[in-house]
Swiss-Prot record:
InterPro entries to which the protein is assigned, alphabetical: Chaperone_TCP-1, Chaperonin_TCP-1_CS, Cpn60/GroEL/TCP-1, GroEL-like_apical_dom_sf, GROEL-like_equatorial_sf, TCP-1-like_intermed_sf, TCP-1_chaperonin, thermosome_alpha
Keyword Chaperone tagged: yes
Subunit architecture: Forms a Heterooligomeric complex of two stacked eight-membered rings.
Protein name in the entry: Thermosome subunit beta
Function per UniProt: Molecular chaperone; binds unfolded polypeptides in vitro, and has a weak ATPase activity.
Keywords: ATP-binding, Chaperone, Nucleotide-binding
Keyword presence, Glycosyltransferase: no
Organism: Thermococcus sp. (strain KS-8)
PROSITE patterns xrefs: TCP1_1, TCP1_2, TCP1_3
Recorded GO MF terms: ATP binding; ATP hydrolysis activity; ATP-dependent protein folding chaperone; unfolded protein binding
Family listed: Belongs to the TCP-1 chaperonin family.
Pfam families for the chain: Cpn60_TCP1 (PF00118)
């Protein structure tokens, strides 16, 4: 509300909240920092887990930053920007989500200190942008080229990604699976590799132990054969993939057939049977002994398929059909009548097996399959879910190295190198931007500090030791949280793709756009929200003051 000649002028509707200038910046920075503090304790191999309970009572236990923020019902718009940081990091690099969010939170904390010194947000943003650009150059210079055929390097990177998660005890076994899965689906394009993660299917089944998790060089489908009289095992499988129903098509128009005698009814039924039989005969004629159908299969068609010794599975998901095509070399056919022997795929074995009391179809022994399945096992639902998250991270990390061929030491080593080098760069810049660049360098130290703190070590003492060792021995020195001392992380096998820290800097820098906001205008809640309807509250300041 403004005043004009002593008269109040109402611009915004009643109930609207508005925060201006430093208040807006303070509230936004505080909201973002709360998000960073929430996930901070999960960082590193000694990080803690979070238990998240939704409104239905479903529980998620994890220390995966992206999962934690995804499961939380966050309302504040600035806090949502931090969630986007984690999502971007997960999408682009596959790991380092917590690192990106923690760095973003620390950059904002340092920015707030600069704002308190009356340094303009534009100067801070410019300084941070210069520092981030320099950080990318430094990461490129310290990255090591590796042979993407070196399975040992890939395995170490996968083990680093799994360490600290619930599946840690079996990390070597799971890392081997992750490496094999990526190598199997990697395709060479020119002189580089490309990995499409959609070709790696994760299938979860409770029961057994984590050690029972296995990689199937083919596809596992959570279905069963359509007819009890069908074969449950086919060796030397010739596989047909059909994405239409093996049923008599209903007309699209509202047509009526008037039947006046039993003979006409019999002829009608016989024609239906003939049409179904022709479909099945065509499948048999081309030499298929296994058929996967995306839609339904008529009871009569099931009978004939069983009679001819053809194994059939119906209502297979489109994504599974595509994976079957890539694994077996089959072509997906829309019309059965167009099926030819060239459209068939091959597998050494197609078999229905019981897993945890439920039937599943295993398609195995494919020649050079470009789609694979990881069947994840574990004692409880929570264990299976966490193993899946660990394997997803491991697979993405291996993918990054296979595609880029570059690694860096992990364990806080790159962040310490960046902090030291960016701080030296600040002296070259001068002006008020120098203060922002120095703040950026100081903010990066939050990673080694947090790694040490989460391991029960003294953060300051550990940081001083590590920086001293780093300056003396080089950019691969980081925090060994198990020994509680500085160590060469490359020698210890603690490595990460260079894409992870590079993307973390990019993602964190995006959150700095929060500093540009000097006015927050939040509309009042809708009436239906007041009555208990679903909708997010807009009272942003109340929880943050």
């Amino acid at each position: 509300m403004a005043q004009l000649a002593g008269q109040p002028v109402v611009i915004l509707p009643e109930g609207t909240q508005r925060y201006v200038g430093r208040d807006a910046q303070r509230l936004n920075i505080l909201a973002a920092r709360i998000i960073a503090e929430t996930v901070r304790t999960t960082l590193g191999p000694k990080g803690m887990d979070k238990m998240l309970v939704d409104s239905l009572g479903d529980i998620v236990i994890t220390n995966d930053g992206a999962t934690i923020l995804d499961e939380m019902d966050i309302q504040h718009p600035a806090a949502k920007m931090m969630v986007e940081v984690a999502k971007t990091q997960d999408k682009e690099a596959g790991d380092g989500t917590t690192t990106a969010v923690v760095i973003a939170g620390e950059l904002l904390r340092k920015a707030e200190e600069l704002l308190d010194q009356n340094i303009h947000p534009s100067i801070i943003i410019k300084g941070y942008a210069l520092a981030a650009e320099k950080a990318q150059e430094i990461l490129d210079s310290i990255a090591r080229d590796v042979d993407v055929e070196d399975r040992e390097i890939l395995k170490k990177a996968a083990m680093t990604a799994i360490t600290g998660k619930a599946a840690e005890e079996e990390r070597e076994y799971l890392a081997e699976i992750a490496v094999e899965a990526v190598k199997q689906v990697a395709e060479k394009v020119g002189d580089r590799y490309h990995v499409d993660l959609d070709n790696i299917k994760f299938e979860k089944k409770e029961g057994g132990s984590v050690k029972d998790t296995q990689l199937i060089k083919g596809v596992v489908i959570d279905k069963e054969v359509v007819h009890p009289g069908m074969r449950k095992r086919v060796e030397g499988a010739k596989i047909a993939l059909i994405n239409e129903a093996l049923e008599v098509k209903e007309t699209e128009t509202d047509a009526e057939i008037r039947i006046t005698s039993p003979e006409q009814l019999q002829a009608f039924l016989e024609q239906e049977e003939k049409m179904l039989r022709e479909m099945v005969d065509k499948i048999k004629e081309v030499g298929a002994n296994v058929v996967f159908v995306q839609k339904g299969i008529d009871d009569l068609a099931q009978h004939y398929l069983a009679k001819y010794g053809i194994m059939a599975v119906r209502r297979v998901k489109k994504s599974d059909m595509e994976k079957l095509a890539k694994a077996t070399g089959a072509k997906i056919v829309t019309n059965v009548r167009d099926l030819t022997p060239e459209d068939l795929g091959e597998a050494e074995l197609v078999e229905q097996r019981k897993v945890a009391g439920e039937n599943m179809i295993f398609v195995e022994g494919c020649k050079n399959p470009k789609a694979v399945t990881i069947l994840i096992r574990g004692g409880t639902e929570h264990v299976v879910d966490e193993v899946e998250r660990a394997l997803e991270d491991a697979v993405k990390v291996v993918k990054d190295i296979v595609e880029d061929g570059k690694i860096v030491a992990a364990g806080g080593a790159p962040e310490i190198e960046l902090a030291i080098s960016v701080d030296e760069y600040a002296k070259e810049v001068g002006g008020k931007e120098q203060l922002a660049i120095e703040a950026f360098a100081e903010a990066l130290k939050v990673i080694p500090r947090t790694l040490a703190g989460n391991a029960g070590l003294d953060p300051i003492e550990t940081l001083v030791k590590v920086i001293a060792a780093h300056k003396e021995k080089g950019p691969t020195i980081g925090v060994d949280v198990f020994e509680g001392e500085p160590a060469d992380m490359l020698e210890r096998g603690v490595i990460a793709p260079v894409r992870v820290p590079k993307q973390a800097i990019k993602s964190a820098k995006a959150a700095i756009m929060i500093l540009r906001i000097d006015d927050v205008i939040a509309a009042s809640k809708l009436e239906k929200d007041k009555e208990g309807g679903k909708g997010g509250t807009r009272d942003f300041g109340s929880d943050l003051d």
